[in-house]
Amino acid sequence: MADLEEGFALTAVPLGSGPDGPLGVEQSGKTDQFLVTDSGRTVILYKVSDQKPLGSWSVKQGQIITCPAVCNFQTGEYIVVHDNKVLRIWNNEDVNLDKVFKATLSAEVYRIHSIQGTEPLVLFKEGAVRGLEALLAEPQQKIETVISDEEVIKWTKFFMVFRHPVLIFITEKHGNYFVYVQKFNSRILSKYTLLLGQEEKCVIQSFSTSVGRKFISLMSLSSDGCVYETLIPIHPSEPEKNQRLVQSQLLKSVVSGSARNGVALAILDQDHIAVLGAPLPASKECLSVWNTKFQTLQTSKELPQGTSGQLWYYGENLFMLHGKFLTVVPFKCEVSSLAGALGKLKHSQDPGIHATPHFVNWETSQGCGLGSQNSEQSKRILRRRKVEVSVQPEVPASTQLLATIQKDSEKHIEVELRKFLATKRTPDFHTIIGDVIIGLLGRCKAEPSFYPCNCLMQLVQTHVLSYSLCPGLMEFALEKTDVQILQLCLQQFPDIPESVTCACLKVFLSIGDDTLQDTDINMESVSDYMDPVQDGEMEEQTAFLQNGFSPEEDNCDSCAQKLKEKPQAAADESTSCPVTPKRAALLNAVLHSAYSETFLLPHLKDIPAQHSTLFLQYLYFLYLKCSENATMTLPGTHPPTLSQIMDWICLLLDANFTVVVMIPEAKRLLLSLYKFVKSQISICSELNKIEVSFRELQKLNQEKNNRELYSIEVLELF
């Protein structure tokens, strides 16, 4: 017996897939998650048990997905093809498909297949097949033509036969059907001609397959409403020759013969099939389950909103498009027996308990028919357990690395870490890296002399970490005053607390120039706009800032007078950078970091006044550099933006103005900022006046044109 349970829609929003339905539904790396590809631009990852999407990815406007997205079970990544030739590979962390891995192929792709236990395969429209790894190694390799002219691929399936991958695809040419079977263990491609027999004028509308010990069972649903079965030998006697296959009728009139669309077929187990379609010409479309052994209808569910004629089957769930919604229909099938068919099979136990059958399935015992899916699954589990037992002594590389961290020397750890990072990344790679850093920091605290700086640098440069994955790393780097690691963390971590950001700023402003000179700092953000500064000049300038008081600049009026008397000298002084290039690169990392003003301001108040002044001078220098360009931007790679510079100037003044205003060397800077703000207000005011003038001129011009268009001349007659 079989039962169809109440179906449910995966989402409350209609699937934007058009009238033809989605391109496909494919299983993800987890049994409860599925990739749904619509016939437009979008791939959605759904979790069936929660009935909600976990992620969504779309190609650019103007591009179109041409084959269903699949999951690479070996890497956990997703693969899709758009515009027939462009292959994209991404994972859950990616957001924009336009920025993920891209490979443009030399031929049009029909389908990508991926199953557990082997690498994905790419089937081209001309019938050629390539493994994904070989194709990515040379995307523009020449693809041969396997099928003849005007042959079109109609259906394809990828499965494992005795642990070896087998691909089957069916083509059609002028009403004739051909079956190709590609076995990859022997590299043999077998071709068969499918003889339709009495139903030669009929069109095959749907295919489905199952695998037994000796044969591949190919079932087809024809336009006459009947289901036919064809047995394809797994080991053909003459694989190189074009052989013929004869169909035999399995079920009669399962759907209406007049149905031209909305028809599909799926094999559920050795005795049951699911059929999608209208059973009578005037009836609505239905989802029904048939018993092929006794040729009886087991259950049926009406679909009043119609369907697209697509049916997918995974585990105990059927997927189909009902109206505009992708719907999941759970089902249950019991093993067929004569007693069960006649209603005489006794069930003494509760319905939830699976009792041992009270009959013998002779076909399964003798191995003559198709092996049941459950028995094959148990055998696969048994074989897999044997394999797992045989490889159990092998310790994972991450576990070995964590053990090495606890006892070996720093040099040996660095070598082992380099080997580990060279291996293929797994889906949990970022958590493993976080565990490795936590292990290193734990040993650093236990052994004060142990500090593997190079190892920590390598781990941060993997670009998979965040502050929350290794919360103690930046605090430990602050203790060691390791500005190199702090700079990297500020550049890469998106979730650094404001207190840690301010602590980094204090270190960057207070560390000596001699220490920075011997430190390797990333200079990308300052290389194109920072003028080289002589050591003598910088020492003199630093000394001036540290002395903190100059009698010549005792009062504010004299500063303003000097600004009026010597504008050129003031300009020269402002355009010289107040910090060394390496310190500037560190400060730029702070400018790029994310923050919230509410949480940042209290910590900025703890920065010493002299350091705040130095930072303000550097920010003002950056603003002047921006003003030199018409675009108001700094040259180079990842320089600070004008908005970042202005925001930090405002933040520093809000937090420290009452303290900074009391420092003598800050007077000229504050006056310069005052003059700058005043000039900006003046410029804005003048621009507003110009805008008003232009509007008035435009208004007068419009009135003049209107008078010319609608003027009437009056002539006085005597």
Curated annotation (Swiss-Prot):
The domain of life is Eukaryota
The family database entries (Pfam families) matched by this protein are listed as: Nol11_C, NOL11_N
Q: List the GO cellular component terms.
A: nucleolus; t-UTP complex
Q: Does the keyword Transcription apply?
A: yes
One BP term from GO: maturation of SSU-rRNA
On this chain, the residues bearing N6-methyllysine are 346
What keywords tag this UniProt record? Activator, Methylation, Nucleus, Ribosome biogenesis, rRNA processing, Transcription, Transcription regulation
Protein localization: Nucleus, Nucleolus
Q: Does the keyword tRNA-binding apply?
A: no
Role summary: Ribosome biogenesis factor. May be required for both optimal rDNA transcription and small subunit (SSU) pre-rRNA processing at sites A', A0, 1 and 2b.
Q: Its quaternary structure?
A: Interacts with UTP4. Interacts with FBL/fibrillarin in a transcription-dependent manner. May associate with the proposed t-UTP subcomplex of the SSU processome containing at least UTP4, WDR43, HEATR1, UTP15, WDR75.
Q: What is this protein called?
A: Nucleolar protein 11
